[in-house]
Amino acid sequence: MSYRRETRETLVVVELVPGAVAQVETPIPFLTHMVETFLFYAGLGGRVYAEEKRRLDDGHHVIEDVAIALGRALDQLIGDRSAVARYGWAAVPMDDAFALAAVDLGGRPYWVVKAKLPNVAIGGYPLPMFPHWVRSLASEARATIHIYARGRDPHHKVEAAHKALGLALRAAVSPASGVQSTKGVLK
């Protein structure tokens, strides 16, 4: 599945291929690293390309637009949700950090991120943008995402969260027979 988002600020192209190797290129090194990490643990590959057409801020538009495009491509890939497990969760320790992530692909966007992150940037990525990235991804993928991360090293907390989110998504999209809802429909 692919999605292209072009605004005055950014150009983002996402092409998702299950089981392939991910090629990620963004102008923000830490964002590139986190998207590669998320896709690897989700069992997804393909291509994510982002460019900043004009510099307006600290990367906010690039980070947000990558999450929007990735969420829309995921929504297309998941389809009508009639044959997926729907729920997935994972716990990931990474040195001092520990992250839990849970995903519901029931079609209702919601997000919770509980992680104390300092107001600093790592590799051009302002850490206060992480909850916004999750919100944008959840909204466009029509998913509920809960992430809880703790630890001393903020890099490790955010990376463990991306690993856990990828693993949770991999579980949620695993094959299932029939619609996973007592209502009989996921919309």
UniProtKB/Swiss-Prot annotation:
Q: Which GO terms describe its cellular component?
A: cytoplasm
Indicate yes or no for the key word NADP.
Answer: no
Q: Name one GO biological process term.
A: L-histidine biosynthetic process
Question: Pathway it acts in?
Answer: Amino-acid biosynthesis; L-histidine biosynthesis; L-histidine from 5-phospho-alpha-D-ribose 1-diphosphate: step 6/9
List the InterPro entries hit by this protein, alphabetically: IGPD_sf, ImidazoleglycerolP_deHydtase, ImidazoleglycerP_deHydtase_CS, Ribosomal_Su5_D2-typ_SF
Q: Which UniProt keywords apply?
A: Amino-acid biosynthesis, Cytoplasm, Histidine biosynthesis, Lyase
Where in or outside the cell it occurs: the entry states: Cytoplasm
Q: What EC number(s) are associated with this protein in UniProt?
A: 4.2.1.19
Say which enzyme class the record assigns. lyase
Cystine bridges: none
What organism is this sequence from?
Answer: Pyrobaculum calidifontis (strain DSM 21063 / JCM 11548 / VA1)
Official protein name in the record: Imidazoleglycerol-phosphate dehydratase
The reactions it catalyses are:
D-erythro-1-(imidazol-4-yl)glycerol 3-phosphate = 3-(imidazol-4-yl)-2-oxopropyl phosphate + H2O
